[in-house]
Amino acid sequence: MSTGFFGNLQPISYEGPQSDNPLAFRHYNPDEVVLGKRLEDHLRFAVCYWHTFVWPGGDPFGGQTFERPWFGDTMERARLKADVAFELFEILGVPFFTFHDADVRPEGASYSESVARLNDIADYIAAKMEKTGVRLLWGTANLFSHRRFMAGAATNPDPDVFAYAAATVKACIDVTKRLNGENYVLWGGREGYETLLNTDLGRELDQLGRFLSMVVDYKHRIGFKGAILIEPKPQEPTKHQYDFDVGTVYGFLKRYGLEDEVKVNIEQGHALLAGHSFEHELALAATLGIFGSIDMNRNDYQSGWDTDQFPNNAPEAALAYYYILQAGGFTTGGTNFDAKLRRQSLDPEDLVAAHIGGMDICAQGLKAAARMIEDKALSGPLEERYSGWNATEAQAMLKGERSLEAIAERVARENLDPKPRSGRQEKLENIINRYV
């Protein structure tokens, strides 16, 4: 039985690029075959629980603007929230969803009550998954909202908070496994510090390393087949976060011997906060062998914080999916919309329209990326740029067959005087726009 929240809205269909129907897909046809795979299987779209069904529409200067019938701290409201969530999943035709424990159940008076409520709602959600065929892309624990975590979870100076966080993650991994989740995510929003004056940096990093090692050990002990993912972010809410960016996370994983066990979930907005482009973080993660999944959104170009808006820039999406496809595409990961409505967008239809737009932009970007790969539009010029390294002498230098002295001798003997060559950046940028 329908909740009635979305009125008479029917499942969204593909009508093609010429359609002017605001509630239809113009670029996303889930069954369209691209590079030998259905578009749905390339993109693996997911709707997130937190921004879509939990966020009240507040900002630092004003409170709640959204009035949702499921808002409240009872299990009855939690079940209504799940009812509405799965209605949206079916309207959009998305194959996946994502959640934090605190998104799906109200906080209990104790740890045990919170876990009992999580298990209760997990049974309810499992029945809906069975009925609809919608799957869980990943689960995670909210270790940042409650005041107990104000000084961190794994990095907290109080060992009891560390223990509480560890127990919470165990419960969330258990539920993620029970719901056949394909990944488990850890985001360290409070894992960092505001000032070094009250922070033992080395101790906190070691605590975080031990915590993550326990998570990996537990995954293997219970036979959870999904990937463990860290989501990098440089700041916000914490001033200095330990999972700053992909490079920082990789260094952390190497230090604690976890580089073969943990991958990254990369968010577009977090990449920008770290001073990088989205494609930089994607390409680096792929190069380092730790690419896992993405949170797709965008930040406002003028604001200096994480605005979590729905994506609307096709060239940016094309570059992102270009590097994802070059890395072999998603395996357990997917495209999770970590994006929220603007606080004035009050209508149920706004939730649908926002996701339609995001899904269309991603589809448009991926199809452009696929065409660039097929035509070698970017890889051809790249191969040419580095072609000199195919020469015998160049290969000998790379393989360690030439010492510094031997190279210096050859440079002097051959009177080498290399001339600069154009990087052709503008031509390459024009290619992106042409394919989009």
UniProtKB/Swiss-Prot annotation:
Spell out the InterPro entries in the cross-references.
Xyl_isomerase-like_sf, Xylose_isom_bac, Xylose_isomerase
Instruction: Identify the EC number(s).
Output: 5.3.1.5
Q: What is its main location?
A: cytoplasm
The catalytic site is made up of H100, D103
Q: Which GO terms describe its molecular function?
A: magnesium ion binding; xylose isomerase activity
The subcellular location is: Cytoplasm
Gene Ontology biological process terms from the UniProt entry: D-xylose metabolic process
User: What is one term from the GO cellular component aspect held by the record?
Assistant: cytoplasm
* Cofactor(s) required, per the database record: Mg(2+)
| UniProt cofactor note | Binds 2 magnesium ions per subunit.
Gene3D superfamilies recorded:
Divalent-metal-dependent TIM barrel enzymes
Q: Which UniProt keywords apply?
A: Carbohydrate metabolism, Cytoplasm, Isomerase, Magnesium, Metal-binding, Xylose metabolism
Q: What class of enzyme is it?
A: isomerase
- Where, in this chain's numbering, is Mg(2+) 2 bound? E267, H270, D306, D308
Per its record, the protein catalyses: alpha-D-xylose = alpha-D-xylulofuranose
PROSITE patterns registered for this protein in UniProt: XYLOSE_ISOMERASE
Quick one: which residues bind Mg(2+) 1?
A: E231, E267, D295, D338
Q: Does the keyword Transmembrane apply?
A: no
State whether it acts alone or in a complex, and with which partners, per the record.
Homotetramer.
Record family assignment: Belongs to the xylose isomerase family.
The protein's name: Xylose isomerase
Q: Per the UniProt entry, what species is this protein from, by scientific name?
A: Chelativorans sp. (strain BNC1)
